[in-house]
């Protein structure tokens, strides 16, 4: 039922470079992936240090990439911050990434609401609560949600 981990065929540095060639990873994420492949902790640390020294691994670049990706998906600032914290990106790096990728969160919330609800204003309290929950899940603040839901159906 359970398979025993086989000894990896690539060195930890080669495996790290191979993973980073596909897409950017955070330091912790790369550590986890290498550990799952069965590499020793010392080898993983050496591979991560090698990647950091050669600028193959950069948490700021990774965080900025994640911010762009989440904004494209219609996620708000709170959700993006939470996702990056789960991937153990430092708070200072998250702040820098958010500052370097400026967004109008109010307009993004409005666009997300418009896309989901087709510009239709809630008819009753239950429907309004559903719209608020959707935008909260997406990571928008209450001010942003109020702004987004204040627009009337313009048809």
Swiss-Prot record:
Gene3D superfamilies xrefs: Winged helix-like DNA-binding domain superfamily/Winged helix DNA-binding domain
Record's GO cellular component terms: cytoplasm
Pfam family for this entry, one: RecX_HTH3
Main location: cytoplasm
InterPro entries, alphabetized: RecX_HTH_1st, RecX_HTH_2nd, RecX_HTH_3rd, Regulatory_RecX, WH-like_DNA-bd_sf
Transmembrane segments: none
Alphabetically ordered keywords of this record: Cytoplasm
Subcellular location: Cytoplasm
A biological process from GO: regulation of DNA repair
PANTHER family documented for this protein: REGULATORY PROTEIN RECX FAMILY PROTEIN
Similarity field: Belongs to the RecX family.
UniProt function note: Modulates RecA activity.
Protein name: Regulatory protein RecX
Lineage: Bacteria, Pseudomonadati, Pseudomonadota, Gammaproteobacteria, Vibrionales
């Amino acid at each position: 039922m359970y398979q025993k981990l086989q000894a990896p065929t690539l060195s930890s540095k080669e495996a790290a470079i191979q993973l980073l060639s596909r897409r950017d990873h955070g330091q912790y994420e790369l550590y986890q992936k290498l550990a799952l492949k069965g590499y020793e902790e010392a080898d993983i640390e050496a591979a991560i240090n090698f990647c950091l020294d050669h600028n193959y691994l950069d948490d700021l670049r990774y965080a900025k990439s994640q911010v762009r990706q989440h904004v494209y998906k219609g996620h708000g600032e709170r959700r993006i911050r939470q996702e990056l914290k789960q991937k153990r990106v430092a708070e200072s790096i998250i702040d820098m990434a958010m500052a370097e990728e400026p967004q109008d969160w109010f307009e993004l919330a409005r666009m997300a609401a418009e896309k989901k609800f087709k510009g239709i204003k809630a008819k009753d309290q239950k429907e309004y609560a559903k719209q608020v929950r959707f935008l909260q899940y997406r990571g928008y603040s209450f001010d942003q949600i109020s702004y987004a839901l204040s627009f009337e159906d313009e048809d």
